[in-house]
């Protein structure tokens, strides 16, 4: 009999999250321990999720039972930039449910987080994984693990047939599939298959628990929230990206050197990404807009600053699959190093299954609005239209 694709308890340990949540959490502990934030869930489709509210609440309540184990702490201690005081903080950390508010608002599922940034930062990824898996339990009860494995092997066979040996030797891929996975067991199976059978270079996973389980490198640096929060953390708005990057440099001293570029837009980011930052950071991550146009802007920027693009890396993570990744690899080969973070296409691509398009984004910091504009207008998220207009005015965004 086939193993069930679903587990009764969806999130079973504290490290079943994306690595960049921990790297940002450490930076928040050291720099902004008193910052207050608000987050909001959004389903970008018209799907009605309200029938699942009771089960979602039950799974959220079970998060409060989790604590980090000695073995998990030992794994984190081996990462050179994870500091002893942060390890001690994690040893005491528990999910505090008073910061989570669920319900139905305007006929739609509502999830809000309000509280200290340090204590709500880890909720985002498990909440998204819970919503996704609860919904999939109801809609796709008959799906088997073998179906997910078969689909993934078809993709690996395609890549093996399509790419040359030389291309495969340099083709770097990481799993970024935690937040919108079909289920935990599908992601676990996918990472196991990729480690064992990926024909290119499987460099790791964003999921800290799975990195530990399969002896892989945990992958991730910063998310949009890091740059967004700095819009209300003290500096002038025009200096917010500079402040976010500078704080990151002081925290990690050259480690974790991939910067995210589309909190405002790529053009606004590059205006702040001067020679100092361009030398200090190892590269950039793409998460919206046309990836090739973005890459050309990045390469031109490095060249303008007198930096060899081949000393830098571009990480792509926006809605990728293997064919898109291979096209980008071929287009940029020999010009700049590239790596690909593939998410939903690895962990929720099963025949007959419609993946969810859900996010939880920061909407306020210290009682004031924050926003992400991005290089794809549909990805803008902020409840305050006046603040979005002001942000665009300050950064001279014309879209």
Swiss-Prot record:
Pathway: Cofactor biosynthesis; NAD(+) biosynthesis; nicotinate D-ribonucleotide from nicotinate: step 1/1. It comes from the Bacteria. It holds the Pfam family NAPRTase. Transiently phosphorylated on a His residue during the reaction cycle. Phosphorylation strongly increases the affinity for substrates and increases the rate of nicotinate D-ribonucleotide production. Dephosphorylation regenerates the low-affinity form of the enzyme, leading to product release. GO terms for cellular component: cytosol. HAMAP family: NAPRTase. It comes from Ectopseudomonas mendocina (strain ymp). InterPro entries: N/Namide_PRibTrfase, NAPRTase_N, Nic_PRibTrfase, Nic_PRibTrfase-Fam, Nicotinate_pribotase-like_C. GO terms for molecular function: nicotinate phosphoribosyltransferase activity. One of its GO terms (biological process) is NAD biosynthetic process via the salvage pathway. It catalyses: nicotinate + 5-phospho-alpha-D-ribose 1-diphosphate + ATP + H2O = nicotinate beta-D-ribonucleotide + ADP + phosphate + diphosphate. This is Nicotinate phosphoribosyltransferase. The lineage of its organism: Bacteria, Pseudomonadati, Pseudomonadota, Gammaproteobacteria, Pseudomonadales. The keyword Ligase applies. Belongs to the NAPRTase family. Catalyzes the synthesis of beta-nicotinate D-ribonucleotide from nicotinate and 5-phospho-D-ribose 1-phosphate at the expense of ATP. Its EC number is 6.3.4.21.
């Amino acid at each position: 009999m086939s193993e069930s694709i679903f587990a009764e308890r969806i999130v079973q340990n504290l490290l079943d999250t994306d690595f960049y949540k921990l790297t940002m959490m450490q930076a928040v502990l050291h720099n902004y321990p008193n910052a207050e934030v608000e987050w909001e869930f959004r389903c970008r489709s018209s799907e009605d999720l309200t029938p699942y509210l009771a089960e979602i609440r039950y799974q959220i309540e079970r998060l409060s039972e989790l604590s980090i184990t000695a073995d998990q702490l030992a794994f984190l201690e081996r990462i050179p930039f994870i500091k002893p005081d942060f390890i001690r903080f994690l040893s005491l950390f528990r999910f505090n449910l008073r910061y989570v508010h669920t319900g139905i608002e305007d006929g739609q599922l509502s999830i809000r987080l309000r509280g200290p940034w340090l204590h709500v930062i880890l909720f985002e990824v498990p909440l998204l994984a819970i919503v996704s898996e609860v919904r999939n339990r109801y809609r796709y009860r008959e799906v088997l693990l073998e179906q997910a494995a078969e689909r993934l092997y078809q993709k690996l066979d395609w890549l093996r047939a399509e790419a040359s040996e030389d291309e495969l030797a340099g083709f770097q891929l990481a799993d970024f599939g935690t937040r919108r996975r079909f289920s935990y067991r599908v992601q676990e199976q996918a990472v196991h298959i990729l480690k064992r059978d990926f024909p290119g270079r499987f460099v790791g996973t964003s999921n800290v628990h799975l990195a530990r389980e399969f002896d892989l490198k945990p992958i991730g640096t910063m998310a949009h929230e890091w740059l967004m929060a700095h819009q209300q953390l003290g500096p002038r708005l025009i200096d917010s990206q500079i402040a976010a990057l500078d704080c990151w440099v002081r925290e990690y001293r050259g480690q974790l050197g991939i910067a995210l570029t589309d909190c405002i837009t790529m053009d606004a980011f590059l205006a702040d990404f001067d020679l100092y930052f361009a030398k200090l950071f190892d590269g950039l991550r793409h998460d919206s807009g046309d990836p090739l146009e973005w890459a050309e802007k990045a390469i031109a920027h490095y060249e303008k600053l007198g930096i060899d693009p081949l000393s830098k890396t571009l990480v792509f993570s926006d809605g990728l699959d293997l064919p898109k990744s291979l096209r980008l690899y071929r287009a940029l080969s020999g010009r700049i190093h590239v790596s690909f973070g593939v998410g939903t296409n690895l962990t929720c691509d099963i025949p007959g299954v419609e993946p969810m398009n859900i996010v939880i984004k920061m909407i306020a910091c210290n009682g004031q609005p924050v926003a992400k504009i991005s290089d794809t207008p549909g990805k803008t998220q902020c409840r305050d239209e006046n603040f979005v207009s002001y942000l665009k005015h300050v950064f001279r965004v014309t879209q």
